[in-house]
Design a protein with these regions (language model features):
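Cys/His-coordinated zinc-binding microdomains
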Residues: 85, 133, 156
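Short cysteine-rich clusters marking metal-coordination/redox-active sites
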Residues: 81, 129-132
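N-terminal post-signal-peptidase region of extra-cytosolic proteins
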Residues: 57-74
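Short, non-ligating residues that shape and space the ligands of small metal-coordination modules
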Residues: 90-91, 138-139, 161
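N-terminal secretory signal peptides and thylakoid transit peptides that target proteins
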Residues: 1-17
Length: 172
């Protein structure tokens, strides 16, 4: 890559967020058969989740690292979207990434959609619940083998259901 190409690319970074609502941020389901997407506005969920969860899920905030009890929690079960209760992750895919957030090697197929996030200037892959659209976290390419992915989740955006308990009905 020559210097001119590099400088042109760097100079264009500040305008990329202006276009992210079109091609760069289009939801891309992780499976050919994602769950049916709900049409509720974010305000629908405000009285169904905590204020902190609502900020993360529907304003795309991030909880402080180390603040979630789910970070160092390793019981068998399933991790659901805190808003609509769609199962997102299985406990056997959870691992300690050392980041201070619950991390997983892979989601349940079809449970999440992704989009590019440019809030820190460089692109990151953000992921959302495929059903209610609630923001969960970001996926990085520094996870353990064999998949090499780290699905880094906000704990407040999750609800854990132990393996010996039935899953609650979907909400919404």
């Amino acid at each position: 890559m020559n210097r001119r190409t590099l400088l042109t690319g760097l100079a264009s970074l500040p305008v990329l967020p202006l276009f992210s609502g079109f091609t760069l941020a289009a939801d891309s389901p992780l499976s050919a058969q994602p769950p049916t997407r709900l049409a509720h506005p974010p305000s629908y969920w405000r009285d169904k989740v905590s204020a902190e969860a609502w900020k993360v899920l529907f304003e795309e905030a991030t909880e402080r690292p180390g603040s979630s009890p789910l970070d160092q929690f390793y019981e068998p079960g399933n991790y659901l979207c805190a808003a609509c209760y769609l199962p997102l992750f299985r406990s056997e895919d959870k691992y300690d990434s050392g980041t201070g957030w619950p991390s997983f090697t892979q989601p349940i197929e079809g449970a999440l959609g992704t989009k590019l996030d440019f809030r820190l200037l460089w692109p990151r892959t953000e992921y959302h619940c495929a059903r209610c659209g609630g923001h969960q976290g970001h996926v990085f390419n520094d996870g353990p083998a064999p998949l090499g992915k780290r699905w880094c989740n906000n704990g407040v955006a999750l609800r854990f259901v132990p393996a010996d308990q039935p899953l609650p009905p979907l909400r919404g």
